[in-house]
UniProtKB/Swiss-Prot annotation:
The gene is pth. HAMAP family: Pept_tRNA_hydro_bact. Its EC number is 3.1.1.29. This is Peptidyl-tRNA hydrolase. It is found in: Cytoplasm. The lineage of its organism: Bacteria, Pseudomonadati, Pseudomonadota, Gammaproteobacteria, Enterobacterales.
Amino acid sequence: MSSIKLIVGLANPGAEYAQTRHNAGAWYVDLLALRHNQQLKEESKFFGYTARLNLAGQDVRLLVPSTFMNLSGKAVAAMAGFYRILPEEILVAHDELDIPPGVAKLKLGGGNGGHNGLKDIQSKLGNNPNFYRLRIGIGHPGDKSKVTGFVLGNPPASEQTLIDDAIDESIRCTEVLLKEDITKAMNRLHSFKAGAQ
């Protein structure tokens, strides 16, 4: 059984970014709240939108920072500090260029893969990388110079469906993570591929 007390969905704020690939982490948290009949509400002291729910018998707080992506650590550190939540009790959901749409991966600790949101969170948690990451695949444009435009672009409908399916399965696997352990959650999530029969 894994103890997760805070689930964070990374995003850029504002309507113009809401449907961009970079906001995949927030899509996951929004759907998780919706599934539990909760609505994220703005809470200025945590620099973001928050909710609280009972997930697999555990008291879990949700957070979507309202800062820009590269300042996400400010919101995460504020909430973790206030509720005395340790890095290893935090799950951060984010978009992942190195994974195709329709696939998501779960891991504990590791590098930031050049993701500015993860970089800032790790820095604000005292350079402790030992938090859970839910990596939601968005695919790669194939050329490094196109990455910024790609992550800040909206996926076509076919890709959006695949990403949504992976998020849906990720929510089921989050419950497995909380009820059982990371190995079982990873085994299930890593064998899932949206669109595969």
